[in-house]
Amino acid sequence: MAEVGEIIEGCRLPVLRRNQDNEDEWPLAEILSVKDISGRKLFYVHYIDFNKRLDEWVTHERLDLKKIQFPKKEAKTPTKNGLPGSRPGSPEREVPASAQASGKTLPIPVQITLRFNLPKEREAIPGGEPDQPLSSSSCLQPNHRSTKRKVEVVSPATPVPSETAPASVFPQNGSARRAVAAQPGRKRKSNCLGTDEDSQDSSDGIPSAPRMTGSLVSDRSHDDIVTRMKNIECIELGRHRLKPWYFSPYPQELTTLPVLYLCEFCLKYGRSLKCLQRHLTKCDLRHPPGNEIYRKGTISFFEIDGRKNKSYSQNLCLLAKCFLDHKTLYYDTDPFLFYVMTEYDCKGFHIVGYFSKEKESTEDYNVACILTLPPYQRRGYGKLLIEFSYELSKVEGKTGTPEKPLSDLGLLSYRSYWSQTILEILMGLKSESGERPQITINEISEITSIKKEDVISTLQYLNLINYYKGQYILTLSEDIVDGHERAMLKRLLRIDSKCLHFTPKDWSKRGKW
């Protein structure tokens, strides 16, 4: 059995932790750092195959020293492409070599006629009106903004019809087929963390949200040990205290503080409560800077130009990076617009979440980063942010898609939103002359502003596309219909287009943003 003094960085051993059921478990963890406070050693551990947000400092009493694995000496191997620091390519980010070599793209059906009928008792289904935070990111932008973005390729789970192939849709008895069955070719994580989006997401005919104890998302964003560790202990923002999930590049002198104090209106940071109180006597903001372009009830959205409000935008990015691991933070906020969602009370407009987007996007991205702050998660705000981004796309007359890669929680939220939105369209179709209703992929995309590729991938994800008697059909099972109705009953927050006061700008004609 090893001694406590023998534990070094890189060691792996079981560590005691409490799971979501308040039960003890001993997952394997890696020691990332060791520190000594008043003669007492603390160890910063990362639980293997769990999300980094669960990393923590522990004492030696929680370590199983009997099963310790010491780090092996690394063999000298040539680096990738001869470049120091190169990492193995990620299968989630790289395009298959065969596709690159041939210069071909995956076939995407554009004009598919979808025909279907619903059970008689469901022909007239009242439209449900009515979601939690989301954790995806800001001027947090992907690592390669100016270079060509890598494409995330997902193998189709069901046959993809050609561009002109007709499709019909039939209902199925709920007992005949469950909503979504895992099939070869569909990437599906068995253990994913799910605290960001709505709990009701699992009820719309798609798999239940991942468990609370972590995900299989790999720590590939940063190689150096500093950025793999949380550096801020606690953040006080208004009436909330937040425990950061990830590293954020706040000034080094602030990382030793027990609490970092932020002004909830301008997001400036201070070392102490006294500093914050002095700042509040001078800060005259009671809402985010910029124009209020939406208000309904207590919910408002403010549009903020990253060039005109640089300080606020940078502070927003620093805060968001505490809860986003898959983006790189840049301080050049000029090319971005930020849309901040707030909740109003007698003291002012309190930030709930936000999303950012490029002023000019050649890839039709309508969201660069998106986040709902932890205190407001699981309350429907995640889908509200997503819905608002697509509402802006409708006004702009464009289809849009979120920038890749999405976080695990962001992907959950978008999958749920796409599924509910598309099912809402399909179930609202009325038959003409006794024939089954018909709709094309293009029409769905135009109605919802969801990009065609996302429409197709969602239909595949829900396992709705089938081949029947020489044509492609959409099959809505009883489980899908029932699950969708239950989900829509829980979705109380919706965007009202009548409350949106937004005029899109043509940034291509403005030279410098």
Curated annotation (Swiss-Prot):
Instruction: Map out region (Disordered) in residue numbers.
Output: 69-106, 122-217
* Stated consequence of mutating S90A: Impaired phosphorylation and decreased acetyltransferase activity, leading to decreased ability to promote homologous recombination (HR)repair in response to DNA double-strand breaks (DSBs)
Q: How is its activity regulated?
A: Acyltransferase and acetyltransferase activities are activated by phosphorylation and autoacetylation. Autoacetylation activates the histone acetyltransferase activity.
Residues annotated as carrying N6-acetyllysine in the record are: K52, K104, K120, K148, K150, K187, K189, K327
Q: Which residues form the MYST-type HAT domain?
A: 227-504
Cited PROSITE patterns: MYST_HAT
How is this protein named in the record?
Histone acetyltransferase KAT5
